[in-house]
Amino acid sequence: MARFLSILLCFAMATGLAAGIRYPDRVLGRCSTHDLSKMEIDTNLDGVYSPHRSFCTCGSGEVYFTAKDRRNHSNYRVYVCGMPTEFCTAENPVRDPKKGNRWLQCRCRQYKMVIYRDWLVLCE
């Protein structure tokens, strides 16, 4: 219940900020926002991946989103690590036996997150 309320509060903050946000990575208190339309991820695998609107939280509270390879349209899971603008990848990605996709995996700090339009809001 506390987790739900904190995410709801974070969403309320994002809603209030949406009209005034002009630049990515603006920080308000302990929440930070990121303009997803401008974000790209440079991995150590096959080049640059563009994020799509597929966001989830792991059971541990880790935050990740799915990125798509522009060339072969493979989906990759990218975690938000450390500071919200830092992304980490695994040296040896594993393959999802059900979908056949390779997923990037690593340990990350815990963040709560919410999506508002094209903005990702992360709250510690």
Curated annotation (Swiss-Prot):
| Record remark on domains | The cysteine framework is XIV (C-C-C-C).
Q: How is it modified after translation?
A: Contain 2 disulfide bonds.
Instruction: Output the Gene Ontology terms for molecular function.
Output: toxin activity
Signal peptide positions are 1-20
> What does this protein's UniProt record list under function?
Probable neurotoxin.
**Species this chain originates from:** Conus imperialis (Imperial cone)
| Cellular compartments per GO CC | extracellular region
Coiled coil segments of this chain: none
**Protein name as it appears in the record:** Conotoxin Im14.2
Major location category of this protein: secreted
Which residues are trimmed away as propeptide when the chain matures? Answer: 21-99
Tissue and organ expression note = Expressed by the venom duct.
| Keywords, sorted A to Z | Cleavage on pair of basic residues, Disulfide bond, Neurotoxin, Secreted, Signal, Toxin
- The yes or no answer to whether the keyword Protein transport is present is no
**Subcellular location field:** Secreted
